[in-house]
Amino acid sequence: MFPGMGGVGGRGMNPAKMKQMMKQMGIDVKELKDVEEVVIKTADSNIVIENANVTIMTVQGSETYQIVGDVKEVPKSLEIPAEDIKLVMEQTGVSEEEARNALKNSNGDLAEAIVALSSA
């Protein structure tokens, strides 16, 4: 084990000592406050991280971002077939616009869209 790290009895290192060691090694860590969501855009989809906790670690001038939160992947162009819209409209009795929105919100999942509209 590493000296001063604790390890015995489930005790960790003293936070002040850890901060001092990190400073000596040229490492700065800070939390980005009030982050609502983080979006990572790729060619095929957007990765949306909601309720995000973002930590920035700076080591020798390079920044590394650590993001923790609720991850959701959203396809960039979700084509909703007319038959799917019609089916949702027939099953739930809603307008075309409401059916289209429900399908978009469910990433094209018919059952999820119908359940969401039926329970609303």
UniProtKB/Swiss-Prot annotation:
It holds the Pfam family UBA_HYPK. GO terms for biological process: protein transport. GO terms for molecular function: RNA binding. Gene3D superfamilies: DNA helicase RuvA subunit, C-terminal domain, Nascent polypeptide-associated complex domain. Keywords: Protein transport, RNA-binding, Transport. CDD domains: NAC_NACA, UBA_AeNAC. The keyword Transport applies. The keyword RNA-binding applies. InterPro entries: NAC-like_UBA, NAC_A/B_dom_sf, NAC_arc, Nas_poly-pep-assoc_cplx_dom, UBA-like_sf. Residues 12-80 form the NAC-A/B domain. Contacts the emerging nascent chain on the ribosome. Homodimer. Interacts with the ribosome. Binds ribosomal RNA. Belongs to the NAC-alpha family. This is Nascent polypeptide-associated complex protein. It comes from Methanosarcina mazei (strain ATCC BAA-159 / DSM 3647 / Goe1 / Go1 / JCM 11833 / OCM 88). The gene is nac.
